[in-house]
A protein has these predicted regions:
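RNA-contacting regions in translation and RNA-metabolism proteins
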Residues: 1-46, 57-78
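An amphipathic, aromatic/His-enriched active-site/gating alpha helix that lines ligand/cofactor pockets
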Residues: 54
Length: 78
């Protein structure tokens, strides 16, 4: 079983300038996993990317990881 919270945390820490500020909240509702990624305000642009491309890529990778366990994932960035 893939630890989605740790996967998202690792991806985000690799992108941002302040990896210490990265945290992830997880809530599970059946097969649906809701993840909220918190990053420093200065790093928000790096995580979202131009026109949201980085955020979309992160969500795509997380969906692929979740589908391996027949789960659905929702990633919110704050």
């Amino acid at each position: 079983m893939t630890d989605l919270k740790e996967t998202l945390c690792g991806i985000a820490r690799a992108i941002v300038d302040d990896p210490e500020s990265v945290s992830v909240e997880e809530s599970v509702d059946g097969k649906r996993v809701n993840l909220t990624l918190h990053v420093a305000e200065d790093d928000m642009g790096m995580v979202i990317g131009k026109q949201g491309r980085i955020a979309k890529a992160i969500r795509t990778v997380m969906r692929a990881a979740a589908s391996a366990d027949n789960r659905d994932v929702n990633v919110e960035i704050r």
